[in-house]
């Protein structure tokens, strides 16, 4: 068992979880194994490629594909929000995440620490799934108090 913690919240008929980057504090292989055992249908990676490479996690997408887990890589700078030109990819990810959750599946979102970028994406997904912003944020912060670290992330998450 790794030290990776999955912070889960029910959304729709499914489960949405936030976590830190696999391999951040321990073995990438062990963390990956724990994620696979959790059985997500969809994983969203928000770290930049250099962050993955620094922790020997550069082939994470290949690892997920090998076991049939759908994966989206939306690199976003630490403490940042998506760039305008990245919005179509984010829109596609949110639509996919909501679809998986409404079908009763599990969706995992991770950044480096599992707080700011992950919280921003999770809140946006929860709102897109039909939740009101404030109750969704409250539920999210019950499981992950550090979810969303900047006012820019909060504004971006709440805009649809």
Task: Give, region by region, the residue ranges found by the protein language model.
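Short beta-strand-to-coil "C-cap" segments at the C-terminal boundary of structured domains/repeats
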Residues: 158-160
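A phosphate-binding catalytic loop at a beta-strand-loop-alpha-helix junction
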Residues: 101-123, 127
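Cysteine-based protein phosphatase catalytic domain of the PTP/DSP
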Residues: 13-106, 129-156
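Homeobox/homeodomain signature
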Residues: 6-8, 61, 105, 116
């Amino acid at each position: 068992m790794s030290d990776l913690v999955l912070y889960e919240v029910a959304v729709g008929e499914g489960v949405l979880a936030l976590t830190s980057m696999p391999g951040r504090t321990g073995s990438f292989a062990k963390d990956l194994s724990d994620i696979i055992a959790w059985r997500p249908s969809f994983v969203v990676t928000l770290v930049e490629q250099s962050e993955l490479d620094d922790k020997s996690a550069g082939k994470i997408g290949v690892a997920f594909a090998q076991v049939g887990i759908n994966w989206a890589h939306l690199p976003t700078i630490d403490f940042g929000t998506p760039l305008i030109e990245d919005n179509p990819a984010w829109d596609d990810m949110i639509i996919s995440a909501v679809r998986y959750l409404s079908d009763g599946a599990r969706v995992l979102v991770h950044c480096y620490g599992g707080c700011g970028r992950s919280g921003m994406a999770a809140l946006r997904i929860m709102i897109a799934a039909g939740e009101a912003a404030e109750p969704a944020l409250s539920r999210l912060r019950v499981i992950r108090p550090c979810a969303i670290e900047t006012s820019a992330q909060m504004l971006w998450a709440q805009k649809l």
